Amino acid sequence: MAVSDPIADFLNRIKNGQKARFDKVDIPASRMKASLSRILKEEGYIKNFKLIKDDKQGIIRVQIKYGEHREGAITGIKRVSRPGCRVYVGHDEIPRVMNGMGIGIVSTSKGIMTDRQARKEGIGGELLCSIW
């Protein structure tokens, strides 16, 4: 069965894997999910990710990051723009997540980037999700 919201599926697999204390989670690959994984790694929310080729679309293997007491690096994830209700924001309307303690991920004309990068470059776009 096809997934109606692949980004929400990506975020939920990471969240559920962290709650179940898995070391890694396998997710069906796409370019957008690879970009999201790259941002999560750069911001320190996941340890690493690896693209694995297979006969179909490929797999992204995400290594989940934990603290010294096995608490997850991700406290919360919220999907903002959904297929049924898209949310677009200008560069001056991008909200700060947890007063700057979290990140917002924005899909812009220059690619997928964090809320800080979008504000710095002065471009808005679709607000995909918030992570803290």
Swiss-Prot record:
This is Small ribosomal subunit protein uS8. Part of the 30S ribosomal subunit. Contacts proteins S5 and S12. InterPro entries: Ribosomal_uS8, Ribosomal_uS8_CS, Ribosomal_uS8_sf. It holds the Pfam family Ribosomal_S8. It comes from the Bacteria. One of the primary rRNA binding proteins, it binds directly to 16S rRNA central domain where it helps coordinate assembly of the platform of the 30S subunit. GO terms for molecular function: rRNA binding; structural constituent of ribosome. GO terms for biological process: translation. The gene is rpsH. Belongs to the universal ribosomal protein uS8 family. PROSITE patterns: RIBOSOMAL_S8. The keyword Chloroplast does not apply. GO terms for cellular component: ribonucleoprotein complex; ribosome.
